[in-house]
Amino acid sequence: MQIKFLTTLATVLTSVAAMGDLAFNLGVKNDDGTCKDVSTFEGDLDFLKSHSKIIKTYAVSDCNTLQNLGPAAEAEGFQIQLGIWPNDDAHFEAEKEALQNYLPKISVSTIKIFLVGSEALYREDLTASELASKINEIKDLVKGIKDKNGKSYSSVPVGTVDSWNVLVDGASKPAIDAADVVYSNSFSYWQKNSQANASYSLFDDVMQALQTLQTAKGSTDIEFWVGETGWPTDGSSYGDSVPSVENAADQWQKGICALRAWGINVAVYEAFDEAWKPDTSGTSSVEKHWGVWQSDKTLKYSIDCKFN
């Protein structure tokens, strides 16, 4: 079974690069729940830049994210996978207004991609057709926005992010077709996997999503990212999934490092713990503990990939 899986995976990944890129999902709030300012973001990015120079976010207007993070990212030489929240009309209008106000203040090279929605299909916030419409609306919007040097943002791809299992469902096709690039999220923890099965499950999820997207786009030569994956270091168990530093370290090596070795780009969830987050019913405190680093920037486990 494992040999068949690896053979199929190799077929799917025939055209990818030798080593996948690494990015980090980055929270926009301090431990006390207040919003990070430019200097705080600069501190975060200065700390992260020896590990990656790509970060991913979820919204533009919330916490003045683009207003504060954009200049910090440009100053530190980072690219942003910029999330845009599309789920309700008022929020979406605020997102578009923020794009129009703050994209002209930075360079187009600072934005790696616009990502419209984060698991909007998985949560059933939008239908695939509704999400496709929002993606196309952002494409039209950014074509008319120029950066601080007069360059158009039309060169920046516009995509979306959703859970792997939703992407392999045929109902997601309108959104996949509209998106220039699609990121796939996969968490073995939320699938109640034991540690022994966690990395295998992650690979299987990623393979299914990638194969679906390659088929939809009619090519194996597509840009592809795992938009979120990781393992919590504290909180309650979820089925056979047990949060711990040891298990997170194991999933980093056998899951994240291994995916990158196959040429898969991975945006890890997440850079730093977020102590401000509330407990979630049934998974007490787990949302606070997904960071590779504690909120004070103490590393929890080695993130050097060991390919031995």
Swiss-Prot record:
Top EC group: hydrolase
Q: Which residues form the active site?
A: 119, 228
Set out the biological process GO terms recorded for this chain's protein.
Answer: adhesion of symbiont to host; biological process involved in interaction with host; carbohydrate metabolic process; cell wall organization; fungal-type cell wall organization; single-species biofilm formation in or on host organism; single-species biofilm formation on inanimate substrate
Q: Which family does it belong to?
A: Belongs to the glycosyl hydrolase 17 family.
Molecular function GO labels: 1,3-beta-glucanosyltransferase activity; glucan endo-1,3-beta-D-glucosidase activity; glucan exo-1,3-beta-glucosidase activity; glucanosyltransferase activity
Give me the gene this protein comes from: BGL2
Q: Does the record carry Glycoprotein as a key word? A: yes
- In Swiss-Prot or TrEMBL terms, this protein is called Glucan 1,3-beta-glucosidase BGL2
From which source organism is this entry?
A: Candida albicans (strain SC5314 / ATCC MYA-2876)
